[in-house]
Each structure stands twice: as structure tokens, then as C-alpha cells.
Amino acid sequence: MTQLARPDLARCPSGRDHVRPDCATSELVAAGHPERPRAARPVPGWVVSTAFLAPAVLVAGWLIGAALQPASYSPMRETVSVLAGYSGTDRWVMTAALLVVGACQIATGAGLTAVRLPARVLLILTGLSTLGIAATPEPATGPTSRHLAFAVSCVVTTVVWPVLVARRAPAQPWIVSVYGCATVTVIFAGLSCWLLIAARDGGGDLGMVERLTSAVQALFPLVVALALRQTAGRRNQRQRGQVTLTG
């Protein structure tokens, strides 16, 4: 009597068997079909524009504002806040410039998605502090506590920002690497200490120190945006070339 062969359940897939997506991907890669690499997140052109406008409008504002002041005003000794203060002539020029700078900083922080979220939030806080400086004009008797609070907040957030921008990923521009951002932070901290000392001592170079510190610190978001935009473009172009060759 012939015995029917029993089916081998271990070798016969059932209807409940399914292929896991990660296993399928691994099999495709092993078979010579590599998974398409993820494209780098680009920096939009409008973010580069807002990052450029912030330092450009800041410098233009204090140059035009200083030109409208009487001969007694000295940009070497007196701060930018005097231009937007109640004692300044045509103070609307510097006030409008500060409003534009703050808005550009907020827009840059919102659109610079190539950096981590804490760095974006801190740049937005810097913009809000700049708006606060414009909203609290300095009286003729000197800066108010609210004005000083916004000014100090702007200095602190600007010094800390490079730390949050730093990246450990390979093939990154030096300026956004850990060592590059640490160097920038040390420079910003040194300039800020110089500014605080000049403000405390009431030296004759307070205006010059403030302008130098503000201009250098306002340029860094533009440098970061340009570096990340260029890196993302090169990486995406290289990945497209790899996909074309493997396809």
C-alpha cells in the first residue's frame, strides 16, 4: 500500500507568510539594487536673502542714521541705541532698520531647517530681542532696564548660537564643524566681553566696539546658510550621479 507523502510544512509557505519590508530591502541591496540615498535638505534661496539682509540693513541703518545726526554725535563714542533713542535726530531711520533686522533674523531662524531645532529657536529669540530693542527707545538720560535686558539677551543668544549649530557629521564645512563653531563662539565671547567692559568703563571707543561686535555676529547666520546650501547642493548632485550609474 502506497503511503501518500506528507507535505513539509517548513518548506511550504502558508498564506499567513509575508515578507518583511526591511528583509526585502536587504535582499534588493544584496542582489545589486542599492537603496536610493536620502537627499540632503537644501537651504532655500530666500533664507540666504534674509540672512544677508540682516547685517546689510544693520550697517546701512547706523551709517545713514549717523549721517543725519548733528556734528556733536560721535559714532566712535556713542552707541547705535542713541540713533534710535529719543535724543536722536530722525530716529525712525535706525528704529526701522532694527525692525527689519529683527524680522530677518526671525525669518532666517524659521527657514534654516538644515540646522537643528534648538539653533533655529535661539535665532528666532535673537530676532525677538532685536525687535525689543527697537520697541524700547533709549531716553536722553540713558538706557532703561527693559532696553538693557533686550540688549543683553541679544548678546547672549548670539554667543551661544554657534554651539547649537555645530555638527559632528562627516564631510561638513569647517565653519559648521565642532571645532569651527567652538572657534566662532570664543571669538564672539571675546568681542562681547570687550563690549561689556567698554560699556562699564564708559570708554571713548564704546560705539566702535558695539558696531564691530554687532556686524561680526550678524554675519555668521549668512556664513552658515551659504556653507550648508553649497554642501547640500554638492551632496545631492553626487547622489544623483550614483543613482544614474547604478540604474
Predicted segments with their positions:
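Actinobacteria-biased recognition of intrinsically disordered, low-complexity terminal regions
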Residues: 1-50, 228-247
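Hydrophobic, aromatic-enriched alpha-helical segments typical of multi-pass transmembrane helices
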Residues: 41-73, 79, 83, 87-230
